[in-house]
Amino acid sequence: MKVIGISGSARKNGNTSLLIQAVFKELEQQGIDTELIQLSDKEIVPCKACFACKGKAACVIKSDAFATCFDKLLAADGIVLGSPVYSADVSAKMKAFLERAGVIIACHPHLLRHKIGACVAAVRRGGGLTAVVIQ
């Protein structure tokens, strides 16, 4: 079994990554393979709402790191999404990733069938619940 963690923090190895690593520690004790993807050093452009993915089950934008991250997500058995909370919402990078992934998944819901998911939010004040529900 393999679990992918995606950290939407702008800071590499920040609190969000630490939270995902805490989840990974428990999973690894059970013999589960884990991999952390940090969006901090990756460019993810926003969705263009072109719906060209409707027939392909893949985003047609190829100029950024989305496809590589999304392919790893699809290949995994489990997914942990993590984001800091900015203005009562997930980070801009996580939002861009979720919007693009969301359109593909809405058009092809079978892609996530039988996958286990969890989310974590690094939050100091309000907005944590909103961020977790969005993820």
Positions of PLM-derived features:
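N-terminal beta1-alpha1-beta2 submodule of the flavodoxin-like/Rossmannoid cofactor-binding fold
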Residues: M1-C107
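Short, glycine-/small-residue-rich phosphate/pyrophosphate-handling segment
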Residues: A92-K93, C107-Q135
